[in-house]
A protein has these predicted regions:
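A structural feature that tracks compact, well-ordered secondary-structure segments
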Residues: 9-15, 21, 54-57, 81-83, ...
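A contiguous binding-surface segment within folded domains or other stable secondary-structure elements
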Residues: 49-66
Length: 134
């Protein structure tokens, strides 16, 4: 069901500093900041030859990343994202097997302009999973 690893998301306390580190220290191709108000984050994508890194920074007081950074002030890996061909079929199959979908269970449009869902980390060995339709 899951396909390619789309990205690894890292919550950061300083988006500008983290972007500069990836660009200047690691020599990666770093995109511009992009506000995603429906998800309460500002994101920056870093293009790698085989996948992407998504830097996450809180957008607004209700941002889920704000709480993550309060618990992890230095930042850290927040979630991993896998591609799926049919997000509704994937959701239904996972729910039948007992997996919990976070939020309203209906896909939202993600930072790439495609439908996404998040799966509860308690159902996946402590890892928050994002599914993105390709």
């Amino acid at each position: 069901m899951i396909g390619r690893l789309n990205h690894v998301a890292i919550a950061v306390p300083d988006l500008q500093a983290a972007s500069a580190q990836y660009e200047h220290t690691l020599g990666a191709v770093v995109g511009p900041p992009q506000d995603e108000p429906d998800h309460g984050v500002t994101v920056v994508f870093i293009e790698l030859p085989n996948t992407k890194i998504e830097l996450l920074y809180p957008l607004g007081d209700d941002s889920p990343i704000k709480g993550f950074l309060e618990k992890n002030p230095s930042g850290g890996i927040h979630h991993i994202c896998y591609e799926v061909e049919d997000i509704l079929a994937a959701r239904d199959r996972l729910k039948e097997q007992g997996a919990r979908v976070l939020g309203s269970v209906e896909p939202k449009i993600g930072a790439h302009g495609k439908p996404v869902l998040f799966l509860h980390p308690k159902d996946f060995n402590g890892c928050l999973i994002e599914l993105e339709q390709v």
